[in-house]
């Protein structure tokens, strides 16, 4: 919790410093920006935290995940017992456990906090992974919950949203004034077109930052899964995932929280939420002092 608060404060300080430099260079009076900053923060953080609060509901609805309340099969019983054991070891509340219909080998975790989470696995995972590999995948998802990754991503996304809204309007106003030659006139239609275009451009860079952080947290979740299930099991699970070439059926709003992400080269890698599986496996093999 304290790590997330520190990261949040540090990110805000960095953003404020950068905003101050940008406004100084562009000749913008910070005193005139208070209203815009408040509006941007309300929309930037509001949307991010509403998504976080609704994440469990939306994930279950979009994937059709069925929560296991009373296990009906040995597999469901094993899933509940494994998640319960790992949650206790990680010091978090027991998450809801669900299964969703999907041919790919995948799983995801979501939820507003460490004690109100959801861990779901695909039917494809249950069909193609053995229990050791599945245990490691569950450990990976429990590590996401224990690390508070969903909350941290919401905080980061809120900061980035706010910065995009503010910077697009500041730069858009300057461009509009320079083109029109009249700083005192009201904003015309061209201003809103410029702002929209700038939000697209700045939003692209904000997405790169968010995805960079997402890739970092995947390495941490792999390490957490190795601690909970064993490093050899975690490596075996990732190797199994590398053979999974089926289409990812997870909805876009859930894909960032799955254990298996997309693949890509060049610039496309900057927009991927997951690092390449080869890099994740190499990081685990290079780690020392991890539980086997």
From Swiss-Prot:
Its cofactor is Zn(2+). The keyword Nucleus does not apply. It comes from the Bacteria. Its EC number is 3.4.24.-. It is found in: Cell inner membrane. Belongs to the peptidase M48B family. This is Protease HtpX. It comes from Xanthomonas oryzae pv. oryzae (strain PXO99A).
């Amino acid at each position: 919790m304290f790590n997330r608060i520190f990261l949040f404060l540090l990110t805000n300080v960095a953003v404020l410093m950068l905003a101050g430099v940008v406004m100084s260079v562009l000749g913008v009076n910070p005193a005139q920006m208070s209203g815009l900053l408040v509006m941007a923060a309300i929309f930037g953080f509001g949307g991010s935290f509403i998504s976080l609060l609704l994440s469990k509901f939306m994930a279950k609805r979009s994937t059709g995940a069925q929560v296991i309340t009373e296990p009906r099969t040995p597999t469901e019983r094993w899933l509940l017992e494994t998640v319960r054991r790992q949650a206790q070891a990680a010091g978090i509340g027991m998450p809801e456990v669900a299964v969703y219909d999907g041919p790919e080998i995948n799983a995801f975790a979501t939820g507003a906090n460490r004690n109100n989470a959801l861990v779901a696995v695909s039917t494809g995972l249950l069909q193609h992974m053995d229990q050791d590999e599945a245990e490691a995948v569950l450990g990976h998802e429990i590590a996401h919950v224990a690390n508070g990754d969903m909350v941290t991503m919401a905080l980061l996304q809120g900061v980035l949203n706010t910065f995009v809204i503010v910077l697009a309007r500041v730069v858009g106003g300057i461009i509009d004034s320079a083109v029109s030659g009249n700083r005192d006139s009201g904003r015309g239609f061209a201003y809103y077109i410029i702002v929209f275009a700038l939000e697209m451009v700045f939003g692209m860079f904000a997405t790169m930052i968010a995805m960079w952080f997402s890739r970092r947290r995947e390495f941490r979740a792999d390490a957490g899964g190795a601690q909970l299930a064993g490093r050899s099991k975690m490596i075996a699970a990732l190797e199994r995932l590398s053979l999974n070439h089926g289409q990812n059926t997870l909805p876009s709003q859930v894909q960032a929280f799955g254990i298996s992400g997309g693949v890509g080269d060049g610039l496309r890698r900057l927009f991927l939420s997951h690092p390449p599986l080869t890099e994740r496996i190499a990081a685990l093999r290079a780690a020392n002092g991890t539980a086997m």
